[in-house]
């Protein structure tokens, strides 16, 4: 049960964070997925020096947030330690919410992000065409920083979002044996656009598959990615950390 996993991680929060700090993790971004989480996510960040927050509505929850007011998202996004907008985007794989509702909220998040110049954290699954169409249309109204998180899309989609100026974050999926297409694309992402993440509590990388994913497991994904790209772990850690602070510019190193 996902809820049980998240509660377990929250209950063990300090131990989980300490394990990550022990392998060199310097900062954490706790991403919200629905409005009911915002206060807790932001509150945790405000109490913990190296933890930051985002506010947003995951596309799975678009239907239950059909009445979300722009002013509410804007006010929450102005909170202390809030450094990003999201997770938002489109998910046509599960289709848990009406697609038009997903599109509406995606655009609303972008609008707030553009005003505050905070990066949009984008989830996209089986929705490449509509995601690109919205990104191109919204970029035409004025630039905004953005990140495709937990990238699993096609190389063509990846190149198009790079051409739009977005960054791409790679999760533990890249370590999976059947992720050959992702591995090939991950080799080609420019150094100044690449980030690494866990998507905790999901998608634990090899050698932790089947376990609850923790922030510290980013070390395993980064190690694999560095080897894949023919780079040293120190080099990859240095430039992906630099990219994080450049994109999430409200965070302080």
What kind of feature is each model-predicted range?
Residues 1-253:
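Mid-domain alpha/beta scaffold segments of enzyme catalytic cores
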């Amino acid at each position: 049960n996902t809820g049980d996993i998240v509660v377990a991680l929250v209950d063990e929060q300090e131990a989980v964070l300490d394990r990550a700090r022990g392998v060199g993790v310097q900062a954490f971004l706790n991403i919200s997925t629905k409005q009911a989480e915002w206060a807790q996510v932001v509150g945790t960040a405000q109490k913990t020096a190296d933890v930051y927050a985002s506010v947003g509505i995951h596309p799975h929850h678009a239907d239950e947030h059909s009445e979300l007011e722009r002013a509410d998202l804007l006010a929450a996004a102005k909170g202390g330690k809030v450094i990003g907008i999201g997770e938002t985007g489109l998910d046509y794989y599960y289709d848990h919410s009406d697609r038009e509702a997903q599109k509406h909220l995606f655009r609303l998040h972008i609008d707030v992000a553009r005003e505050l110049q905070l990066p949009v954290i984008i989830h996209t699954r089986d929705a490449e065409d509509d995601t690109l169409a919205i990104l191109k249309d919204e970029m035409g109204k004025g630039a905004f920083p953005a990140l495709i998180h937990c990238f699993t899309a096609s190389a063509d989609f990846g190149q198009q979002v790079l051409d739009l100026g977005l960054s791409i974050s790679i999760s533990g999926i890249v370590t999976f044996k059947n992720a050959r297409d992702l591995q090939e694309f991950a080799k080609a992402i420019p150094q100044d656009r690449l980030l690494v993440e866990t998507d905790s509590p999901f998608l634990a990388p090899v050698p932790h598959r089947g376990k609850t994913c923790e922030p510290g497991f980013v070390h395993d994904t980064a190690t694999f990615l560095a080897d894949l790209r023919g780079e040293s772990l120190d080099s990859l850690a240095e430039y992906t950390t630099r990219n994080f602070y450049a994109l999430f510019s409200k965070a302080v190193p």
